Swiss-Prot record:
Name of the featured protein: Bifunctional purine biosynthesis protein PurH
Keywords of this entry: Acetylation, Hydrolase, Multifunctional enzyme, Purine biosynthesis, Transferase
Domain notes: The IMP cyclohydrolase activity resides in the N-terminal region.
Chain ranges of the MGS-like domain: 1-148
Coiled-coil spans in chain: none
Modified residues (N6-acetyllysine): K287
Source organism: Escherichia coli (strain SMS-3-5 / SECEC)
Originating gene: purH
Family listed: Belongs to the PurH family.
Alphabetized InterPro entries for the sequence: AICAR_Tfase_dup_dom_sf, Cytidine_deaminase-like, MGS-like_dom, MGS-like_dom_sf, PurH-like
Domain of life: Bacteria
Amino acid sequence: MQQRRPVRRALLSVSDKAGIVEFAQALSARGVELLSTGGTARLLAEKGLPVTEVSDYTGFPEMMDGRVKTLHPKVHGGILGRRGQDDTIMEEHQIQPIDMVVVNLYPFAQTVAREGCSLEDAVENIDIGGPTMVRSAAKNHKDVAIVVKSSDYDAIIKEIDANEGSLTLETRFDLAIKAFEHTAAYDSMIANYFGSMVPAYHGESKEAAGRFPRTLNLNFIKKQDMRYGENSHQQAAFYIEENVKEASVATATQVQGKALSYNNIADTDAALECVKEFAEPACVIVKHANPCGVAIGNSILDAYDRAYKTDPTSAFGGIIAFNRELDAETAQAIISRQFVEVIIAPSASEEALKITAAKQNVRVLTCGQWGERVPGLDFKRVNGGLLVQDRDLGMVGAEELRVVTKRQPSEQELRDALFCWKVAKFVKSNAIVYAKNNMTIGIGAGQMSRVYSAKIAGIKAADEGLEVKGSSMASDAFFPFRDGIDAAAAAGVTCVIQPGGSIRDDEVIAAADEHGIAMLFTDMRHFRH
């Protein structure tokens, strides 16, 4: 499917001008006639390039403050004209063929992201002529090349040189795919923005208008193909959002190790999002999307040592996340002690990377330091639909807790309660977390009965010889019966933090009082399914 088409005339009109001068120079040097508009034309002319303004080409001036520039039959006829089929009509109307269109669109996303952006500002950054040219060229890809990404400039010049001034149909088709993806994403952004403006137009509160749009348009870019999915018989790929504003596994840089698997990415996300909850040096070890050890310490080495002690068996082959730079001492401790799939941290020292390089299969990721958590949406696919909700960024402080028992917690119990409450948010429901001295000592995850999660947490602590007496316990949701409190008391727990809200709260509180346990209500649940 060679079907080469020579590139003799190109129309260039870009908002993002990165690389456009060099690209235009390369085209001009190869005998390509340049047409252009507005700021792009002025820039090319300033650089000494022979460029024809579209208004001169069409004989019709730009008008309405630039709203109408390229919407003209001589432009779109030149793009849409089918070579060998529409030649006569093109000659009759003095329409010259345009073989390449180089366009990227007004920066709508960047405009509406600016603080104080008005609806009028947004509207003026809705591109009309650009998408029209892009779609016209993509539709007629059998004859015309459409270029919407500056990252394609170099490859296009190389192919023109290799093919005596022409581009192949395969290349034009691939460029057309990118073009349609580009305009689809652009229209989605505009639709989503206008959907968010419904309250302003209808005089309603956001609650009355609805938090979520009537039609949900999502745009993700493929970052990589995976060897397989969650299981070896499933195919998979990793897609990421554009313009992510928060350090994440999606934006992280892999500095060492073999390619990440589907499960690696899911587990690394769980570990990183958990470790972000802590201001102090912290370590989170995750296995199968559940934390199996979490601790804060005087250093990340101290935090790692303590997190590992929670459950060394489960830590084998786990994912380790830190909220400080990975240093050589900590890297050496990990490599000497256990098999690890992934280590992720804001950064890694050169000395640390030399140590981890000795284990070629260890994947090391750096994600940069994070600031405030960014609100967003979470999605869960169901057969035939998609569940959408706000990200669970909720967290309570000591001042928001309610003591509902006769006994008040000690200062250490309170610190441990707040610590394990943060961890419980990232454990699959039903979630129970035991903690003492700012480290987890037992985690019960994913049980259908809350009391069994409590029992498992106690069993794990006992198996590792960790002292439960005087510890705090967090439950991600309320206790429906007193049995969970009885199990915790039998293990040695002396403080419980939970949301409250059960019809049997009085019974549960009475059980805590019987055992001399301090109980704190958060009035906030953290189910995780």
